[in-house]
Amino acid sequence: AAMAAGAAVAMLGGTPTQVGHAVAIVFKNILGLVCDPVAGLVEVPCIKRNGSCALQALAAAELALAGIGSFIPADETIDAMKSVGDSLPCALKETAGGGMATTPTALAWAKKYFAK
């Protein structure tokens, strides 16, 4: 989403500074988002999150192009994202060991899926 935001700004004639603002805005909006795919498949809830992130990218690009800057620079938001990612437990890092992947509905569906 951050790369898409930066690319959108660049394609629409924005400055490198505006690209950085768009990137930072997206990172601040999705900071801490976990990866909890049901049954370990990158489908639920990932597809909907990808759609939401696409909207985040376009919104961030529009904000940056409108002159709305990020108080925290892009490089620092990237560092913060890394720090948060390092702090997350393994269960929330695409392992299907936490979050939505461990709801009763998700576990029941995974059991049926892998029984095939």
Predicted regions and their residues:
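Functionally critical mobile loop/hinge segments
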Residues: G6-K116
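Glycine-rich phosphate/ribose-binding loops and adjacent secondary-structure elements
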Residues: A1
